Amino acid sequence: MDAASIICEEFATSLSPRWNRYLVGAGALEPTGSTMRFVVTGASRRRYSDAQIDDYQGLPRRRFPWRPPLRLTVRARFSHPSGELHGTAGFGFWNDPFVMSGGRLPTLPRAIWFFYASPPSNMKLDPEVPGHGWKAATIDALRPVALPLGFVALPAALLMNAPSLYRRLWPPIQHALNVGEALVPADMTDWHTYVLEWGQKRARFWIDPEEAPSPPFLDAPAPRGPQGFVLWLDNQYLVATPQGRFGWGLLNIEKRQWLEVDYLEIARLP
């Protein structure tokens, strides 16, 4: 499918002024001359640390810049493998529902992205996929068909603590929330080209498609826009399960860890 590039960032020079830098705590950006490293070193569980760029700070959600159809391409690698990298990290599009950068009221999540979370994070929203790890993922909890679920959320969560009821009750809820997930089939410490196509109805994810053309490793329902772009590495963990377990906290990160990016492109699709 032909595409028209809107953003092409190669990180060989200074960071484009279109990006907001969000650097808090022990988070830092380190240009190498040909790449950009998003670094967290010496983070404490007493303070949030984040190295991030985005394009939505200061905007109301209705003015977030991205809607389908589009394609995101990112070439990246991480300093540590899954399970040894601490906190959360990734890149893609979301509606900033938890207002980590401030200025808006909380809301329910919409996202389409490559997302990493280390233990003790547990966001097991797909029965076939672990609650942490390096994933491709989609969610749209603001779909009209999903909103009535709020009235039955508590009793449903209690019932789903029984495995047999979880297997019966969760699949239609997962469908209503447009939840799709799959582990990324690659070593995250190696350089890879990550591609997602966000269509009106479907979201598709590839890894290194230029090396070995193949079907997407995840083909999932697409969330709606508008959403903002984000690329980050931080020291938080999150817990949200169908059984009603919720939690949030911060992790100590003593050793240096990073997400390194050397290419980022966002292109409109016809």
What are the language-model segments listed below?
Residues 34-37, 203:
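Hydrophobic residues embedded in beta-strands of well-ordered beta-sheets
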Residues 38-167:
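Secretory/extracellular carbohydrate-interaction modules
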Residues 1-25:
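Extracellular carbohydrate-recognition regions
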Residues 155-191:
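A mid-sequence, solvent-exposed acidic-amphipathic segment
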Residues 69-73, 80-83, 221-270:
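Ligand-recognition surfaces built from glycine- and aromatic
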Residues 206-211:
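Short strand-turn-strand beta-turns centered on an Asx-Gly dipeptide
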Residues 72-74, 190-198, 203-205:
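Short tryptophan-centered beta-strand motifs in secreted/extracellular beta-sheet-rich domains
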Residues 20-32, 196:
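Short, exposed beta-strand/loop patches in secreted or surface proteins that constitute
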